[in-house]
């Protein structure tokens, strides 16, 4: 006989406790104990409780390998078993007769009656678990999760996603918490009611004037939104949004003018000033290009029975000398030059120039929402999440490292497939390119996607924007990338002693292969790895995954409402075609081109919700679920948190000197995962 003390920790969330009966079986090198009830006098397993139990094993099972946790509803006389009551277990701690503690992290919901098997908390890669019982358990765990979380092809040419139709179909481990879910719907309900009471969601006509638009601008406005309202017509603000707005990933240094963008010296002389030329500035590296060519010929939507229009503009920008502002030099609204595609200039009539800039901003909306936001910052993180759940067991160090960065991602993406990107919902009702345009853009971009785009340092180098001043997305993002990379490198160094150890980890290689096949559709031209051969490659890959799921999403999601609250700054649709000549634009024509009232308010409401985390947040580097139990990774986590705190202090100090602070990549404001 052997006496064990069992300590159990129950989560603190609403509903985490249970009335169900819990027992454990201890599996060792010499056998397995029968189920041992965890039963004290009174109520066990209340939310937030840590409770001790004494259990007696009839025989010595040897060195402990696994813990089987059994949960079943209580049985009442005459009535029989009650309905199962879900339980969130944080961890078990076993104290064997000879002393010492064995910690078994859990951090899972146990919903129905059944058994959950836990391994002692020391992280181990696949080749490090030598005992056949442990090897078998790893395989059985992955088989069960692969049955639970299955792939489906949502749209042709898109990354694959979770095969569930609604959030009601999701199991508790991937659902919003009760508090987060309640806050989300309370926020949505109050905002919808405010718009509805004002009658704005039912008005299908045009805005009467820019002044009338100010009515809607009072809706939940922010300091950044007020700045956009005050400066949206200014060239410097227009250009700055390519650096620090919601789509800071498209601007690139221009070393030569595209043949289909025939800007001349005479056109831009007034901005460049005397003593220079386009060629001189190209050679100096002071010209930049934003090309929305991927939008060329994209399918457009019908809103309120009226066809919408889209453009595929090219915008040439000039970095003023002496750290002056970035300024727009020229805009062409199509990819085909000619008499019907004039090049618009800052010296043109006010309304001609403003209309051209507004067409660029509409292109930014379409590009950002379909690609930068939906594809790169939601669909790809869902791929990383699903592959992690399906291919890495709980005891794998990469599972422990990555699982905090997958929290709620499957819930919010399933919700998006319910409420955003389906017929009759906001993308279909109120955006200029609609669902079909979104789908076509994603299909096009998937064929162009490459690994360097996903790795920030390479992306910055490829676009040639290493030294453009005032590019805070780059500055803050590179600091965070560096902190994540150092953290990941330390963790990888603990568990992978050599390149061969990376190659020999079959679970890691299966994870990478599944991401390549299901996420990137086996496109070798993308440069996305289908296997990893070195520790250096593994560090870069895992850094990319964590950065994409946290900082990248924050940078391109949190500012959506700030940019669109004053709709002319980021119109979701355009109701008249792009101008084919100059000198015809007027204030009335400008307003007639903008989206109707109901579409404006529909999109603003949606982007307000998508910019606002509904509580239950976990900032980057915050890991309350302690999956790692060893001292070495815990020290690395503490160091990572210190680095992030130092980065935050620097960002906040810099922001004190900015008219418009850049806050989207301040670490305390970055969520660990894609959760909204």
Curated annotation (Swiss-Prot):
Its cofactor is Fe cation. It catalyses: (5Z,8Z,11Z,14Z)-eicosatetraenoate + O2 = (15S)-hydroperoxy-(5Z,8Z,11Z,13E)-eicosatetraenoate; (9Z,12Z)-octadecadienoate + O2 = 13-hydroperoxy-(9Z,11E)-octadecadienoate; (5S)-hydroxy-(6E,8Z,11Z,14Z)-eicosatetraenoate + O2 = (5S)-hydroxy-(15S)-hydroperoxy-(6E,8Z,11Z,13E)-eicosatetraenoate; (5S,6R)-dihydroxy-(7E,9E,11Z,14Z)-eicosatetraenoate + O2 = (5S,6R)-dihydroxy-(15S)-hydroperoxy-(7E,9E,11Z,13E)-eicosatetraenoate. Binds 1 Fe cation per subunit. Fe cation binds at residues 373, 378, 553, 676. It is found in: Cytoplasm, Cytosol; Cell membrane; Cytoplasm, Cytoskeleton; Membrane. Pathway: Lipid metabolism; hydroperoxy eicosatetraenoic acid biosynthesis. Ca(2+) 1 binds at residues 15, 17, 85-86. It comes from the Eukaryota. GO terms for biological process: apoptotic process; arachidonate metabolic process; cannabinoid biosynthetic process; endocannabinoid signaling pathway; hepoxilin biosynthetic process; linoleic acid metabolic process; lipid metabolic process; lipid oxidation. InterPro entries: LipOase (IPR000907), LipOase_C (IPR013819), LipOase_C_sf (IPR036226), LipOase_CS (IPR020834), LipOase_Fe_BS (IPR020833), LipOase_mml (IPR001885), PLAT/LH2_dom (IPR001024), PLAT/LH2_dom_sf (IPR036392). Its EC number is 1.13.11.33, 1.13.11.-. Ca(2+) 2 binds at residues 39-40, 42, 44. Keywords: Calcium, Cell junction, Cell membrane, Cytoplasm, Cytoskeleton, Dioxygenase, Iron, Lipid metabolism, Lipid-binding, Membrane, Metal-binding, Nucleus, Oxidoreductase. Expressed in hair, prostate, lung, ovary, lymph node, spinal cord and cornea. Changing residue 486 to H: Does not affect arachidonate 15-lipoxygenase activity; does not impact enzyme structure. Gene3D superfamilies: 3.10.450.60, Lipoxygenase-1, Domain 5 (1.20.245.10), PLAT/LH2 domain (2.60.60.20). Belongs to the lipoxygenase family. This is Polyunsaturated fatty acid lipoxygenase ALOX15B. It comes from Homo sapiens (Human).
């Amino acid at each position: 006989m052997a006496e064990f003390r069992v300590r159990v920790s129950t989560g603190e969330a609403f509903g985490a406790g249970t009335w169900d009966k819990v027992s454990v079986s201890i599996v060792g090198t010499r056998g397995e104990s029968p189920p041992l009830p965890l039963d004290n006098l009174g109520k066990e397993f209340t939310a937030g409780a840590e409770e001790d139990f004494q259990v007696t094993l009839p025989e010595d099972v040897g060195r402990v390998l696994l813990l089987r946790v059994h949960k079943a509803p209580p049985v009442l006389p005459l009535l029989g078993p009650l309905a199962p009551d879900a339980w969130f277990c944080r961890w078990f701690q076993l104290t064997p007769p000879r002393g010492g503690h064995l910690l078994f992290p859990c951090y899972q919901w146990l919903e129905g009656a059944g058994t959950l098997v836990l391994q002692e908390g020391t992280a181990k890669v696949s080749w490090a678990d030598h005992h056949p019982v442990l090897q078998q358990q790893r395989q059985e765990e992955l088989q069960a999760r692969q049955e639970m979380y299955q792939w489906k092809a949502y749209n042709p040419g898109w990354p694959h996603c979770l095969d569930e139709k609604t959030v009601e179909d999701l199991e508790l481990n991937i659902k919003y918490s009760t508090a987060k879910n309640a806050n989300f719907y309370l926020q949505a309900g109050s905002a919808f009611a405010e718009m509805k009471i004002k009658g704005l969601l039912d008005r299908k006509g045009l805005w009467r004037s820019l002044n009338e638009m100010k009515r809607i601008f009072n809706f939940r406005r922010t300091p950044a939104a007020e700045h956009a309202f005050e400066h949206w017509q200014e060239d410097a603000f227009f250009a700055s949004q390519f650096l620090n707005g919601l789509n800071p990933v498209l601007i690139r240094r221009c070393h030569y003018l595209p043949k289909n963008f025939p800007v001349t010296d005479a056109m831009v002389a007034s901005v460049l000033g005397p003593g220079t030329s386009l060629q001189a500035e190209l050679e100096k590296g002071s010209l930049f290009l934003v090309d929305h060519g991927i939008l060329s010929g994209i399918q457009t939507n019908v809103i309120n029975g009226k066809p919408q229009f889209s453009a595929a503009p090219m915008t040439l920008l000039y970095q003023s000398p002496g750290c002056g502002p970035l300024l727009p030099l020229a805009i062409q609204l199509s990819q085909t030059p000619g008499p019907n595609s004039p090049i618009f200039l800052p010296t043109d009539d006010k309304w001609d120039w403003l209309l051209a800039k507004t067409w660029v901003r509409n292109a930014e909306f379409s590009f950002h929402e379909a690609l930068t936001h939906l594809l790169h910052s939601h669909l790809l993180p869902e791929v990383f999440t699903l592959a992690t759940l399906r291919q890495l067991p709980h005891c794998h160090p990469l599972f422990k490292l990555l699982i905090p960065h997958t929290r709620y991602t499957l819930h919010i993406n399933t919700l998006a497939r319910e409420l955003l990107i389906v017929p009759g919902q906001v993308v279909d009702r109120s955006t200029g390119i609609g669902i079909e345009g979104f789908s076509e853009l994603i299909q096009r971009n998937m064929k162009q996607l490459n690994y360097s785009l996903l790795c920030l340092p390479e992306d910055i180098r490829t676009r040639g924007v290493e030294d453009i001043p005032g590019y805070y997305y780059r500055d803050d993002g590179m600091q965070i990338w560096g902190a994540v990379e150092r953290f990941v490198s330390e963790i990888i160094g603990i568990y992978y002693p050599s390149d061969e150890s990376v190659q020999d980890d079959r679970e890691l290689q299966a994870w990478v292969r599944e991401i390549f096949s299901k996420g990137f559709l086996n496109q070798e031209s993308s440069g996305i790895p289908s296997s990893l051969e070195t520790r250096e490659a593994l560090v870069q890959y895992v850094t990319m995954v964590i950065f994409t799921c946290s900082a990248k999403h924050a940078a391109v999601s949190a500012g959506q409402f700030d940019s669109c609250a004053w709709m002319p700054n980021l119109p979701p649709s355009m109701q008249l075609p792009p101008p084919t000549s100059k000198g015809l634009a007027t204030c009335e024509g400008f307003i007639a081109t903008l989206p109707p009232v109901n579409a404006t308010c529909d999109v603003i409401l949606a982007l307000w919700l998508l910019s606002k985390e509904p509580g239950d947040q976990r900032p980057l580097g915050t890991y309350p679920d302690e999956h790692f139990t060893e001292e070495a990774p815990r020290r690395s986590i503490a160091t990572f948190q210190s680095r992030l705190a130092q980065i935050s202090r620097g960002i906040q100090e810099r922001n004190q000197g900015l008219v418009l602070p850049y806050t989207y990549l301040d670490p305390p404001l970055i969520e660990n995962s894609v959760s909204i």
